[in-house]
C-alpha cells in the first residue's frame, strides 16, 4: 500500500534553518513511542503527526504521551483497548451516520494489531470488513474480546 520511508533529514534541515521561526511538525513512519521520542531528540521537531499507526490503535497517542512524560503508566488492558475501539465506532456513527461511520471504522478495526495472535482470525477479519450495522461490529468485537482472553 505505501512504499518508501519518510526522509526525516529534510525535516531536520527545515527545523535547524535559522531563518524559519514557525513550529515544525514532523510526519512519517512514527509507529511507536520510541520513534516519536527519537524524532524529537534527533530532529528537534516541535510536534509529531501520527497517521497510519492510528488505524485500529487509537490508544497510540496515550502510549506516546506516557512514554515521553516517563510516567511509567500501566499499559492498557485488552478490555480497555476494545472499549476504545467500540467508542471509536460509536463516535464515527454519531458524527456521520451509521452506514458511512461503519464503512470508515470497520477497516480500522480489521487492521488493529490487538487481534494478532488470535488463531484462525481471517474469517473474523472478513466479517468485520463486511459488517453493515453497529450491532454486527460490536458483536464481532465481543467475540474477539473473549477469544483474546482465552489465549492469554
Task: Pin down the residues of each PLM region.
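Alpha/beta catalytic cores of nucleotide-metabolism and tRNA/nucleoside-modifying enzymes
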Residues: 2, 9-26, 30-152
Amino acid at each position: 500500500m505505501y512504499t518508501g520511508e519518510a526522509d526525516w533529514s529534510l525535516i531536520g534541515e527545515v527545523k535547524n534553518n535559522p531563518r524559519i521561526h514557525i513550529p515544525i511538525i514532523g510526519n512519517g513512519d512514527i509507529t511507536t513511542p520510541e520513534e516519536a521520542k527519537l524524532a524529537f531528540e534527533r530532529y528537534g521537531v516541535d510536534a509529531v503527526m501520527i497517521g497510519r499507526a492510528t488505524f485500529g490503535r487509537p490508544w497510540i497517542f496515550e502510549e506516546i504521551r506516557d512514554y515521553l512524560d516517563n510516567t511509567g503508566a500501566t499499559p492498557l488492558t485488552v478490555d480497555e483497548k476494545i472499549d476504545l475501539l467500540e467508542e471509536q465506532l460509536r463516535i464515527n456513527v454519531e458524527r456521520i451516520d451509521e452506514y458511512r461511520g461503519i464503512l470508515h471504522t470497520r477497516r480500522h478495526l480489521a487492521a488493529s494489531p490487538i487481534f494478532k495472535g488470535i488463531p484462525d482470525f481471517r474469517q473474523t477479519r472478513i466479517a468485520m470488513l463486511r459488517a453493515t450495522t453497529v450491532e454486527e461490529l460490536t458483536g464481532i468485537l465481543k467475540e474477539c474480546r473473549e477469544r483474546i482472553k482465552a489465549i492469554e
